[in-house]
């Protein structure tokens, strides 16, 4: 669906930003990316490196070859940020968890520029107005919720993108710590394994984000990505994998009490990942009814989008 909407991605070389850039180019949008002069930090702790192997430098080269318009700047440089925003119609922030509160600077720049049709703040997870998460992720979700309130108070046009569980974080290893591939012998399951979760590939997040960006119906609404074939319990996910490898895994179920204890006693990234897994697999933070007045279910709004199913995704690991 080609469109003349000019889209600016902030955080274009991050785990999800890269996929939004690629989806924007594929959709035919004039695509802009704000990049800093500084090289990527190879020592920066990452949650799942295997899901995003490209370096910043490789991505920049790739973007140039695709025709992405690279703008030099930084969200901490108000003047260059305003200048970049004035060139586009839609701003999508894909900054990482450590920069959530810095989005007030983007909001200020958008207000000054005065031309933005829609702002997507950095969310790309569960709905931060509907969760029972624990620390250390709770603070991040609360920061995202506070940014929502600032956006609304300032009258900035917005779309919130709630995509829940990236396959690169939750599915490629069946939510097991210290491995990047699905287990073939034993598997640990948090809770009873019967709580529904919502899985989506990072590439499909990019696709749905750009569809939502180009859709006028998403103005001042939240878009929820809960794809029918990927709305699965952990037990269902494991059953898919067992069928593929022709083997039944030895299962260990961990109580919520023990999970909370493990979170408190672990360091990053284990505590963060466990808290994310706890949110989806035990508390069921992907299970809720949407309000049509302010919510849009992506699979219903864009039924023509062909997405990667959890079953298909796991084929690469057989």
Curated annotation (Swiss-Prot):
Gene3D superfamilies: NAD(P)-binding Rossmann-like Domain, UDP-galactose 4-epimerase, domain 1
Active site, per annotation: 144 (proton acceptor)
E.C. number(s) listed in UniProt: 1.3.1.45
GO BP annotations listed: defense response; lignan biosynthetic process
Entry protein name: Isoflavone reductase
UniProt-annotated binding residues for NADP(+): 11-17, 36, 44, 148
SUPFAM superfamilies: NAD(P)-binding Rossmann-fold domains
Similarity-based family: Belongs to the NmrA-type oxidoreductase family. Isoflavone reductase subfamily.
Alphabetized GO MF terms: 2'-hydroxyisoflavone reductase activity
Effect ascribed to mutating residue 144 to A: Loss of enzyme activity
Superkingdom field: Eukaryota
